[in-house]
């Protein structure tokens, strides 16, 4: 079912243009990361070099942003914009100055052409324009993601773009297929779905639509009651939905959940928050009933633009 859903979506997009768009967004992110070092007066020309300490002192990332900035250095090296000389402990520049504005014009054109999601591109543009403040800790991206307690750009990131909607459709098709088989094998018994780390409910509506008519018990969980409160209002018309606090990094039973209490566990973009993935998977397995399914969505490639924040 998931493969069929994927094939249907693929037939509706221009794969070459979408690849170009993703590549340009990655390149724009690399340009923006490098510009923060150049704005600080380092690595201005091809062949110029600086140590990590010199770069950190010049850019001066905020205390909570140093880890992020080191990820930028790794991304710049992986993209070939910088080369690390291990013998001398220096990062050396391998690319010249580039025009981010010109790259962005093409990104906007392709984004519109492929219906990528204008709100997501707007979010990325805001992040790029505030990158200096962000890396110094003067700008919190959550102010854009959740303005005044609303979801804002969060929906653009997790649901309202072609990549997220495609992934959500594929996961939902798989869950619908599992629920259908469950009903045939267990007539009259509801299929128990537990969504872990459901957050803004980016995937939930797709699952509800795909399983329409199925007999379900749906437990919507997150670590924050903020998201649960929003979900209670959004899904109030579904009496078979319930809500609970759940942390993937804590023991299932100690949090008040019974072993073998789920037939399907859905983890949409949450497993990367695991402190120890083996422990988390073992923990989730406790909750799964025999023959149960774990359905998860996770990126398998780290995109440069996703590392901006």
PLM regions with names:
Residues 190-194, 198-253:
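Class I SAM-dependent methyltransferase SAM/SAH-binding core
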Residues 252-265:
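A short acidic, Gly/Pro-enriched loop at the edge of an enzyme's catalytic core
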Residues 262-278:
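A short SAM/SAH-binding and catalytic strip from SAM-dependent methyltransferases
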Residues 264, 291-309:
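Conserved class I S-adenosyl-L-methionine
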């Amino acid at each position: 079912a998931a493969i069929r859903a994927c094939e249907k979506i693929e037939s509706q997009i221009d794969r070459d243009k979408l690849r170009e768009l993703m590549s340009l967004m990655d390149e724009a992110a690399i340009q923006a990361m490098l510009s923060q070092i150049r704005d600080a007066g380092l690595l201005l020309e091809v062949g110029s070099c600086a140590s990590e300490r010199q770069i950190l002192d010049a850019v001066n990332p905020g205390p909570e942003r140093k880890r992020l900035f080191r990820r930028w250095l790794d991304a710049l090296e992986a993209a070939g914009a910088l080369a690390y000389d291990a013998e001398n402990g220096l990062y050396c520049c391998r690319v010249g100055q580039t025009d981010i504005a010109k790259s962005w014009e093409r990104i906007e054109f392709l984004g519109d052409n492929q219906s990528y999601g204008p709100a997501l591109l707007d979010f990325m543009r805001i992040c790029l324009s505030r990158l200096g403040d962000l890396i110094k800790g003067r700008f919190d991206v959550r102010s854009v993601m959740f303005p005044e307690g609303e979801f804002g750009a969060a929906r653009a990131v997790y649901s309202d773009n072609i990549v997220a909607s495609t992934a959500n459709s594929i996961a939902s098709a798989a869950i619908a297929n599992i629920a259908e088989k469950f009903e045939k094998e267990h007539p009259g018994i509801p299929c128990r779905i537990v969504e872990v780390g459901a957050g803004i409910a980016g995937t939930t509506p797709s699952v509800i639509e795909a399983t329409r008519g199925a007999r379900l018990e749906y437990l919507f969980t997150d670590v924050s009651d903020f998201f649960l409160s929003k979900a209670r209002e959004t899904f109030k018309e579904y009496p078979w939905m319930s809500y609970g606090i759940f942390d993937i990094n804590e023991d299932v039973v100690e949090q008040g959940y019974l072993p073998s209490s789920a037939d399907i566990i859905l983890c949409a973009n949450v497993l990367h928050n695991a402190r120890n993935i083996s422990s988390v998977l073992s923990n989730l397995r406790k909750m799964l009933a025999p023959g149960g399914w774990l359905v998860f969505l996770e990126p398998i490639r780290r995109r440069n633009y996703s590392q901006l924040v």
